[in-house]
C-alpha cells in the first residue's frame, strides 16, 4: 500500500509555513532586524547551536544473535520506515532512552536519511537512528526542529548524496547554527503546525491498517 499524495501535500504546506515564519520572517516584518552569521533576523531573536535546543540520543547496536523473530519489543531499523512488514524483535529490558514512544521525533542518519514522528507503540530503535530529546527546551519545539532539519536535509540533498554523508555526523548536526526565536513564537508556530501533524498521523495509521489487512488476506489465499 502506497502512502497517498495527501501526505506530500501536508509536508509541502508545513514547509511553506516554516519558510514564511523562519526564512522570510513575514509575520515579523514590522520588527527591527539585526545582522547575524545566518543573515538578517528579527532583533529580538538570536542564533545558537542546535545542541542548545535539543539533544541527539543514539540508539543501540545489535548483533544478529540478539535480533529475534518474535519477542516483547520490536526493533526499529532504518529499513522499517520503508518496508514496515519485516521486523526483528527483542526481549531485552533497556534504559528508557533506548526506546521510542508515540510522538517522538526520529532522525535516520545512515544510508537512507529522513525525519519521522513515531506513530506507534513503545519500540526499541536501532543505532542508525537518533531520537531527538527536548529536555533542554520543551516538547512544543518538536515541530520547529522537525521542519528545520527537513530544510537542512533538502539543502544537502541538492549538493548530492556525498555532501549529506559528509555533514550528517552527530557532532556536525549538534554544531549547526540555528535561529532561536522567542519561546512565544515557537508556541505559536507549534499551534499552526500541529493540525497538519495530526492529520498526517491519521493517514499513516490508515495506511498501516490497510497494509496489515492486505498481508492477512494474501496469507490466507496462499494457505
Indicate residue ranges for each PLM-predicted region.
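Sequence-specific dsDNA recognition surfaces
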Residues: 34-35, 48-66, 71-104, 125, ...
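Flexible, active-site-adjacent loop/turn segments at secondary-structure boundaries
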Residues: 20-26, 36-39, 60, 73, ...
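A short beta-sheet element
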Residues: 77, 96-154, 159-162, 169-173
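Juxtamembrane/interface motifs at transmembrane-helix termini
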Residues: 9, 69-72, 84, 167, ...
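Short conserved micro-motifs at the rims of enzyme active sites and ligand-binding pockets
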Residues: 87-88, 119, 190
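Short, glycine-/Ser/Thr-/acidic-enriched flexible segments
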Residues: 55, 81-83, 112-113, 137-138, ...
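Non-catalytic DNA-recognition/assembly elements of restriction-modification systems
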Residues: 1-61, 179, 183-223
Amino acid at each position: 500500500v502506497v502512502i497517498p499524495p495527501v501526505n506530500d501535500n501536508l509536508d509541502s504546506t508545513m514547509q511553506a509555513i516554516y519558510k514564511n515564519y523562519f526564512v522570510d520572517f513575514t509575520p515579523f516584518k514590522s520588527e527591527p532586524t539585526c545582522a547575524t552569521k545566518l543573515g538578517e533576523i528579527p532583533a529580538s531573536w538570536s542564533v545558537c547551536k542546535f545542541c542548545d535546543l535539543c539533544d541527539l540520543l543514539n540508539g543501540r547496536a545489535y548483533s544478529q544473535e540478539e535480533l529475534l523473530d518474535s519477542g516483547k519489543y520490536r526493533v526499529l531499523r532504518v529499513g522499517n520506515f520503508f518496508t514496515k512488514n519485516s521486523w526483528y524483535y527483542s526481549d531485552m529490558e533497556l534504559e528508557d532512552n533506548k526506546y521510542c514512544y508515540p510522538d517522538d521525533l526520529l532522525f535516520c542518519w545512515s544510508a537512507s536519511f529522513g525525519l519521522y514522528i513515531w506513530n506507534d507503540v513503545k519500540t526499541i530503535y536501532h543505532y542508525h537512528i537518533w531520537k531527538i530529546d527536548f529536555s533542554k527546551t520543551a516538547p512544543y519545539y518538536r515541530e520547529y526542529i522537525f521542519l528545520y532539519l527537513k530544510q537542512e536535509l533538502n539543502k544537502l540533498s541538492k549538493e548530492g548524496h556525498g555532501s549529506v554523508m559528509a555533514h550528517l555526523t552527530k557532532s556536525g548536526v549538534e554544531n549547526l547554527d540555528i535561529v532561536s526565536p522567542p519561546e512565544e513564537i515557537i508556541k505559536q508556530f507549534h499551534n499552526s503546525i500541529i493540525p497538519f501533524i495530526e492529520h498526517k498521523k491519521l493517514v499513516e495509521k490508515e495506511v498501516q491498517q490497510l497494509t496489515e489487512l492486505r498481508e492477512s488476506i494474501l496469507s490466507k489465499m496462499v494457505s
